[in-house]
């Protein structure tokens, strides 16, 4: 029965196109998270432009997804959830672009914080890979275990927040602008894991709806 329902949900041409496009969205998130790791680990400002291009491509994919859904892909009960997922994935790409742009405005990152930021960027990347696994699990199964792994990684980042903000108190910023850009950079870097977890929650809602 479950397999037959999934065939009805995912079997149409427009439905398959939307599924493939959402998969491309998540793959873009994976690629962009890897770029962010490179930016933070090696101060590789040259790839900031690649992050911006990924965001533009992601936005075009989101528009295409929404258009196909409103043109009749999926049964009405599922359309809003698929649209929500596309919007949430686009928000992750927006956040990653903001982080990359803010990095250009930061004069320096203390070594003790750079290590923390590298760890966060690496965890965000791992969560992005798991998000693709979670989306594929809508058809293949095993979603609960994947979402649990995402939750555990998100909690690891949450546990780092207090330590990071404590270290921030010891940094001597030259002025308000430098402080503001640095704080926004930290907030957004920490927020990526929350956004990925939110997208995972929407995938879970879709899984329940499909049943």
UniProtKB/Swiss-Prot annotation:
SUPFAM superfamilies: PhoU-like (SSF109755). Pfam families: PhoU_div (PF01865). Disulfide bonds: none annotated. It comes from the Archaea. InterPro entries: DUF47 (IPR002727), PhoU-like_sf (IPR038078), Put_Phosphate_transp_reg (IPR018445). Belongs to the UPF0111 family. This is UPF0111 protein AF_2149.
């Amino acid at each position: 029965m479950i397999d037959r329902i999934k065939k009805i949900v995912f079997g149409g041409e427009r439905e398959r196109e939307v599924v493939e496009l959402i998969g491309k969205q998540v793959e873009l998130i994976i690629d962009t998270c890897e770029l962010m790791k490179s930016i933070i680990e090696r101060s590789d400002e040259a790839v900031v432009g690649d992050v911006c291009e990924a965001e533009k491509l992601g936005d075009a994919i989101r528009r295409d997804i929404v258009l196909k859904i409103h043109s009749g892909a999926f049964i009405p009960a599922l359309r809003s959830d698929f649209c929500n997922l596309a919007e949430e994935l686009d928000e992750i790409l927006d956040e990653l672009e903001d982080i990359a742009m803010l990095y250009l405005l930061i004069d320096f990152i203390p070594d003790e914080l750079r290590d923390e930021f590298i760890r966060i960027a690496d965890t965000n990347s791992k969560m992005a890979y798991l998000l693709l696994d979670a989306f594929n699990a809508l058809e293949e199964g095993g979603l609960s275990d994947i979402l649990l792994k995402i939750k555990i990684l998100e909690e690891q980042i949450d546990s780092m927040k207090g330590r990071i903000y404590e270290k921030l108190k010891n940094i001597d910023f030259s002025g308000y602008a430098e402080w503001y850009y640095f704080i926004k950079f930290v907030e957004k870097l920490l927020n990526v894991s929350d956004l990925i977890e939110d997208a995972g929650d929407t995938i879970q809602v879709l899984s329940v709806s499909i049943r």
